[in-house]
Amino acid sequence: MRPTLAVATATAVTLVVSGCAGWGGGPGGGGPNSINVLMVNNPQMVDLQRLTAANFTADTGINVNFTVLPENDVRDKISQEFSSQAGQYDVATLSNFEIPIYAKSKWIAPLDDYVAADPTFDQSDILPPMTTSLSAADGKLYGEPFYGESSFLMYRKDVLANAGIEMPANPTWQQVADIAARVDGAQPGMAGICLRGQPGWGQVFAPLTTVVNTFGGTWFTKDWQAQVDSAEFRNAVQFYVDLVRTHGETGAPQAGFTECLNNLIQGNAAMWYDATSAAGSLEAATSPVRGKIGYVAAPVVETPSSGWLYAWSWSIQQASTKKDDAWKFISWASSKGYEGLVGSQLGWSRVPAGKRASTYTSEAYLKESSAFAQPTLDAILRADPNNPGVQPRPAPGIQFVDIPEFPDLGTQVSQEVSSAIAGQTSVDAALKRGQQLADDVASRYRERSK
C-alpha cells in the first residue's frame, strides 16, 4: 500500500542477525537453527533487527537472517519469491491486502494450528478487525499483525478554538468542509485542510476510497459491475476534488502522506484526514504541534464509520521447511512481551502498536500516547473490511478492493483524479476513463463466474 505506515530509509540493506549480530549479504544459508526473513525497511522493523539477536536468538538459539528492502522493492521480491515457491525465505512482511490473495494461491501457510498450540501468544488479544483482515475466504488465519492502523481526522485544537469552532466527535464530511472554509488562512500560509492528491492506489485513493464508501459508492457491485461513473462515486470524487482545490494545501496533486504530515507539523494546514499512525510523529517530543492536535473519527456521510484498515504482518511461505521456527519468530515479534521490550529499551512511543487490545490498557504506553491512543483504538475496532459501505461487495477491503488487479487499476484511475485536482481535467472526464479501466477488470471476473 503506501506510505501510510512510516517508511525509513530509501536504501536497501541486507542484515544478518545471529547470536552476535553483523552485516552480511543475502539471506544466510544458515543451518538447522536459522530462518530467513524478508521484510520492509520501516522504522519498526529496523528496531526489530536491533533487538533480535540479544533476545529472540539468545532465548531460542534460532539465528535470524534478515533481508530488508524499501517497500516497492520488497513487494516485488516477495511476489517473485512466493509465486515461485522458491523456499528461500521462511517469513515475510505482507499486508492485509496481499495476505488473502496469497492464501488463495496457496503461497502462504495457515497459522491456526500454531496459534492453537501456543496459548501464550493469546490470539484473543489481537484486535478482531486485524484477525478478520488477515484471514482468507476459507476461514483460516494466514498472518499475524506486527503493527496496524486505521484513519481519522486530525485538527489544530487551538486554531479551531480561536475561530469559535467545536469539532464534533463524529463529524460529517460536510461539517469538515464547512470548518475548512472557516479556518482557511487562519494563520499565514495555513490551508483549511490537507488531503492526499498524489497519484497511487495507496496514495490519493487510500483516503478517497473511504470517502467513496461513505458517500454510498463502490468500485464494483457484488456481481462485478463497474461503478466508477456512478452518481455516488462521482459525488464523492467531486466533493474531494472541490474541497482540496478550494481549501486544501499548496501542491496538492503531488501531496502524499509525508507531505501532509509535514504540512500539519509546520503549521501549513489546520486539519488532515489520514492514517492513525501519523499521530506518533505529531506528538513526538520534538514536534512543534505536540499537544495542539485533536483526533476524531473519520468523517462520514451515509455510513456509521469510514476509517480504513491496514497492517504490516508476518506470513510463512508454504514452501518453507522451517515452519516451526518461523512461527516461533512470529510469535515473539508480535507478542505482548516484544512490545514491552521495545517500550523498556527504545521508548514506548516506538512500540509497534495498533494490533493488541492489551497495548491500550498499558499504563506505560498510555502515558506516551494518551492524546491519540483511544481514538486510534476506536478507529481500528470500527473498521469492517467485509462491510465498508452501503452495498455488498465482490471482494473485501475498505480503502482498496482485495483483488490482484487493484494496484494497477487504482493507480491508473488515481492519475486521472490527480489531474482533476490539478485542474487539468474534469472529474467527469477522469471517471469516464476510470469506468473503462474498471470495466475491463470487472468483465474478466464476470467471464470467470459463468
Segments predicted by a language model, with ranges:
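Extracytoplasmic "Venus flytrap"/periplasmic binding protein-like
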Residues: 55-126, 161-164, 263, 267-271, ...
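Hinge/lid segment of periplasmic solute-binding proteins
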Residues: 96-150, 204-207, 294-296, 380
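Short, solvent-exposed loop/beta-turn-alpha elements that line the ligand-binding surface or hinge
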Residues: 112-126, 169, 193, 197-200, ...
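C-terminal lobe and pocket-closing loops
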Residues: 116, 278-289, 302-411, 449
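Conserved C-terminal helix/tail region of periplasmic/extracytoplasmic solute-binding proteins
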Residues: 161, 384-450
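Glycine-centered hinge/linker elements that transmit conformational signals in sensory
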Residues: 179-182, 222-254, 294, 298
